[in-house]
Regions:
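Non-heme iron-sulfur electron-transfer modules
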Residues: 1-10, 39-64, 72-94, 137-156
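Ordered, small/hydrophobic-rich secondary-structure cores
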Residues: 2-40
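Short, intrinsically disordered, charge-biased short linear motifs at domain edges
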Residues: 12-24, 50-55, 105-111, 115-121
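Cysteine-centered iron-sulfur cluster-binding motifs in ferredoxin-type domains/subunits
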Residues: 21-37, 53-69, 120-129
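Extracellular/lumenal glycan-associated surfaces
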Residues: 69-70, 101-102, 127-135
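Short, solvent-exposed interaction modules
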Residues: 86-118
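Boundary-flanking segments of nucleic-acid-binding domains in nuclear regulatory proteins
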Residues: 115-117, 129, 143-147
């Protein structure tokens, strides 16, 4: 599967062995990254992602936990993330459909190949086809509400 172009992945946080990309418009604050490697993903620090503070493989493993696809990685020594097979769709009481697999998405910016995404289930998103929390449902498993999401690291 071809990896998305770097300019479609979000802001880059480079370290010698791995680059982490963060797309704040897709983050729904599930906090898998913060729980997985708090020394790397620290929303109280600037920059909030420091990929150099852990082993590159450990960073990649935690990034793959991100259910929304807001985080991506590129290892210096390997190809891009491989998709899950078969494709898995999970419903989430907090709003989005969580999808993992070899995804071909039609977006407002054109076609996109993806491995993980939180897709809008309510139809109110301004970031089609991705969930942006427009439904006002709890923003993430960590207990963040929509109001908390607005003051999260993505906006700072």
């Amino acid at each position: 599967m071809a990896a998305p172009a770097d300019d479609r992945l979000g802001r880059a946080y480079a370290a010698p062995e791995v680059t982490v990309f963060y797309d704040r418009g897709r983050c729904r604050h599930y906090a898998e990254c913060v729980r997985g490697l708090p020394q790397v993903f620290d929303p109280t620090r600037r920059p909030w992602i420091r990929a150099d503070l852990a082993d590159a493989q450990a960073v990649a493993e935690v990034v793959r936990r991100c259910p929304t696809g807001a985080l991506h990685y590129r290892l210096l020594t390997e190809e891009a993330e491989e998709p899950t097979s078969p494709t898995i769709i999970t419903t989430d009481s907090r709003g989005p459909l969580l999808v993992r697999g070899d995804l071909a998405l039609d977006t407002t910016e054109g076609p996109l190949r993806e491995t993980r995404a939180a897709l809008c289930a309510c139809g109110r998103t301004q970031n089609q086809p991705f969930c942006d929390g427009a439904c006002g449902v709890n923003a993430g498993a960590a207990g963040g509400t929509r109001d908390q999401a607005e003051t999260s690291p993505q906006k700072r």
